[in-house]
Amino acid sequence: MKKWKSSLLGIAIWSLAASSMAAPKELDKVVTLVNDSVILQSDVNAMLQTVRINAAEQNQPLPDDALLTEQVMEKLIIETLQLQQAEQFGIRIDDTRLDQAVAEIAKERELTIPQLQKELEKSGISYSIFREQMRRDMTASEARTIQVRRRINILPQEVEMLAEQLNKQTLQTVQFNISHIQLRVEEGATKEQREETQQQAQQIVDELKNGADFANLAYSYSKGPKALQGGEWGWMRQEEMPTIFADQIKSNGKGAIIGPFRSGVGYHIIKVNDVKGLETVSVTEVNARHILIKTSVILSDDGAKRQLEKARQDILAGRQTFADEAQKLSSDPGSAANGGELGWQTPDLYVPEFKDKIETLPKGTISEPFKTVHGWHIVEVLDRRNVDRTDAAMKNRAYRILFSRKFNEEAQAWLQELRAGAYIEQLGTNDDQG
């Protein structure tokens, strides 16, 4: 039996159970009451049989029969309780979602759906029962997820602390090529002199972000130890840097400008010239502007489209500006006040049709009218830029780790509470028939 078949343990269990229930036996009986549901002897026997088959094929030891039966019974009780919760929440897994899940399983196994059906049949598993057990599993999982999510609270400081730990681990082997400018604040300087130096440092940062040459500014202004080398410190790991540098450099990518920041001797500015060994995350942001016209009982799709076509022609002909037309026509009050401008955003923020337009439209081109769920639009891409999101990606990773930890803890607690609050009566099983 292929490895993947072991992951279908639950499916096989219910397939075998269905087979045994298809030919009723006198010995089949209710063995456990779980609130208003029942667990049958055939359910227990089917699961015991399947567990033993899988254990034998994988050469795994099993506990004695009494303990194994107890474990099987507990699994059936927990599943029943979760399905009862799902029914209370009105959770239903429709055929479309089920089809997608089955297709995903087939894809993971590098099989087509017909091939998956044949593999199941070879193992004695009915495809229809396979689908229904998947529906049960998905239903129970969704009920569990809904309830457990409500119990999880992740504080921002928890994310920050874990992200910092992850970042330190990541940076142990990373090398940075950095340059540095130091503006000295003399001992005994007045408040006005300190503020003047701070303003000068900020002005230098602004110039650097607008493309000024770092080395030239270092020659002109820096009082640091590498001023005569254009401020360049070369390649260093974080642990090799002066502490004041190491404290500021996190997961900064190539080209990052850091500062100005203060120390006991003055203000500092760092540029990351290059990085070795750091996996950075970069995203493209788009600054676009649009005009949205929503349809209504008095404005049809054709009417909205014609209005935008006329506005587009007026803008292209120079008779109107985009900003004026947006303020006059747009049904999006937030952007209309800004001449239709949406600001810097990642395309993923938008609905699919709008996302596709701003990803493919050449800069400075006004699109033809197109429709989304919000209405009819014309859009112009003003500019694009690549933005380093490594720090945000690290925080996202930290959040996911914390969520996973807490979810597992809270899921166990929820299941225990669910079981403790349920009416469960075990009527006793027959002698093991396996």
From Swiss-Prot:
Uppermost EC category: isomerase
Source organism superkingdom: Bacteria
Record keywords, A-Z: Chaperone, Isomerase, Periplasm, Repeat, Rotamase, Signal
Record's signal peptide: 1-22
Residue intervals of the PpiC domain: 173-274, 283-383
A GO term for molecular function: peptide binding
EC number, as in UniProt: 5.2.1.8
Single biological process term from Gene Ontology: Gram-negative-bacterium-type cell outer membrane assembly
Alphabetized SUPFAM superfamilies for the sequence: FKBP-like, Triger factor/SurA peptide-binding domain-like
Free-text comment on this protein's domains from its UniProt entry: The PPIase activity resides only in the second parvulin domain. The N-terminal region and the C-terminal tail are necessary and sufficient for the chaperone activity of SurA. The PPIase activity is dispensable for SurA to function as a chaperone. The N-terminal region and the C-terminal tail are also required for porin recognition.
Name of the protein in question: Chaperone SurA
Name of the gene encoding the protein in the UniProt record: surA
